[in-house]
């Protein structure tokens, strides 16, 4: 289908729902610019929104409702027609979407790795005993506690600029962030070291952008189809299956990372206790041609982790999280 045919079928307007942080708006603008290139006659607008996840900054996500806090308001805008599509960092999207919504396009992935950011130290290995390291995720916290038990790991909330400001004012000796966000905002110079995926497998979907729509909007799905990257989509389908099968959420240090090598998809899954004392890892690979293949690969990795006792870790962490919420 040529661009003239696509443009002729495009709507007069499209509205993108997005969080209002600088990174989220960059992502929405990235999608807007791609849509404008595809459909020059279409007026593409951005509806900026503040989500509960952006408002609650004094507690970790695992204690206040998880990743859904970042998407609920955007889904409401899709449901009531204020927006036609919503753009997300895929790692922030819950593994199971509410009925009536779907991730219809997954864009080509940025760097999925975690980044070490510090003003005074070149790497995690250079940090002295007792140095304070900030992170927003239990997955990264578990990695730090397992590999660097001499460090003091503390929660770090807020958008990307807020986190960097907290580092710059001396609250932390170093912080761990997703490399993709820093690169997208032109802040790659802040990265002192990129952490190898063997040491710190990323969260499912990290580095990828997902576009969500209401499932009845088949017209929007068709317009978004040219933005979809099939290889990235198959990789993140496998990753998200690992997390979904194990009940993964913000309460569980769970990583899932897939990479293409010589035509096959290699998938690694990892589940840890929050103190890093127990770390379970599983790896599988296969020829993945369809979504069903990707889901099967994800299930194979989750089955292997279950055989190692992953559900014992997951259930204990979920029970502890629920008990903590009850005490709040």
Swiss-Prot record:
Gene Ontology process terms (BP): protoporphyrinogen IX biosynthetic process
Q: What's the cofactor?
A: dipyrromethane
Annotated Gene Ontology cellular component terms = cytoplasm
MF (Gene Ontology) = hydroxymethylbilane synthase activity
- Protein's UniProt keywords contain Transferase: yes
UniProt pathway annotation: Porphyrin-containing compound metabolism; protoporphyrin-IX biosynthesis; coproporphyrinogen-III from 5-aminolevulinate: step 2/4
Q: InterPro entries recorded for this chain?
A: HemC (IPR000860), Porphobilin_deaminase_cofac_BS (IPR022419), Porphobilin_deaminase_N (IPR022417), Porphobilinogen_deaminase_C (IPR022418), Porphobilinogen_deaminase_C_sf (IPR036803)
Modification sites for S-(dipyrrolylmethanemethyl)cysteine: 250
Q: Which residues are listed as membrane-spanning?
A: none
The organism sits in which domain of life? Answer: Bacteria
Q: Which UniProt keywords apply?
A: Porphyrin biosynthesis, Transferase
* Catalysis performed (reactions): 4 porphobilinogen + H2O = hydroxymethylbilane + 4 NH4(+)
Catalytic activity, EC: 2.5.1.61
Report the cofactor remark. Answer: Binds 1 dipyrromethane group covalently.
User: Which Pfam families does the UniProt record give?
Assistant: Porphobil_deam (PF01379), Porphobil_deamC (PF03900)
Keyword Transferase included in the entry's annotation = yes
Additional comment:
The porphobilinogen subunits are added to the dipyrromethane group.
How this chain assembles, per its entry, is:
Monomer.
Which HAMAP family is this protein grouped with?
Porphobil_deam
Q: Which family does it belong to?
A: Belongs to the HMBS family.
Q: What does this protein do?
A: Tetrapolymerization of the monopyrrole PBG into the hydroxymethylbilane pre-uroporphyrinogen in several discrete steps.
- UniProt-recorded name of the protein: Porphobilinogen deaminase
Q: Which organism is it from?
A: Burkholderia ambifaria (strain ATCC BAA-244 / DSM 16087 / CCUG 44356 / LMG 19182 / AMMD) (Burkholderia cepacia (strain AMMD))
Gene this chain is encoded by: hemC
């Amino acid at each position: 289908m040529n661009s003239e045919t696509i443009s002729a079928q495009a709507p007069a307007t499209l509205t993108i729902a997005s969080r209002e942080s600088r990174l989220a708006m960059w992502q929405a603008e990235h999608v807007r610019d791609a849509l404008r290139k595809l459909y020059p006659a279409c007026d593409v607008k951005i509806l900026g929104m503040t989500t509960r996840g952006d408002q609650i900054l004094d507690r970790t996500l695992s204690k206040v409702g998880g990743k859904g806090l970042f998407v609920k308001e955007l889904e409401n805008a899709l449901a009531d027609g204020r927006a036609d599509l919503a753009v997300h960092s895929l790692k922030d999207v819950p593994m199971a979407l509410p009925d009536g919504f779907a991730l219809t396009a997954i864009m080509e992935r940025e760097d999925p790795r975690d980044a070490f950011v510090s003003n005074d130290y070149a790497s995690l290995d250079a940090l002295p005993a007792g140095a304070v390291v900030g992170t927003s995720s239990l997955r990264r916290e578990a990695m730090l506690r397992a590999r660097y038990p001499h460090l003091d790991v503390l929660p770090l909330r807020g958008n990307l600029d807020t986190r960097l400001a907290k580092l710059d004012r001396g609250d932390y000796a170093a912080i761990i962030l997703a490399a993709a966000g820093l690169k997208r905002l032109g802040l790659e110079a802040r990265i002192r070291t990129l952490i190898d995926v063997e040491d710190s497998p990323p969260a499912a979907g990290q580095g990828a952008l997902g576009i969500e729509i209401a499932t009845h909007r088949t017209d929007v799905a068709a317009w978004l189809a040219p933005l979809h990257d099939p290889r990235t989509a198959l990789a993140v389908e496998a990753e998200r299956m690992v997390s979904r099968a194990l009940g993964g959420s913000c309460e569980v240090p769970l990583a899932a990372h897939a990479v293409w090598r010589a035509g096959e998809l290699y998938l690694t899954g990892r589940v840890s206790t929050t103190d890093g004392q127990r770390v379970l890892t599983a790896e599988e690979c296969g020829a993945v041609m369809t979504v069903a293949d990707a889901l099967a690969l994800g299930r194979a990795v989750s089955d292997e982790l279950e055989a190692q006792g992953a559900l014992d870790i997951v259930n204990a962490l979920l029970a502890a999280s629920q008990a903590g919420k009850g005490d709040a």
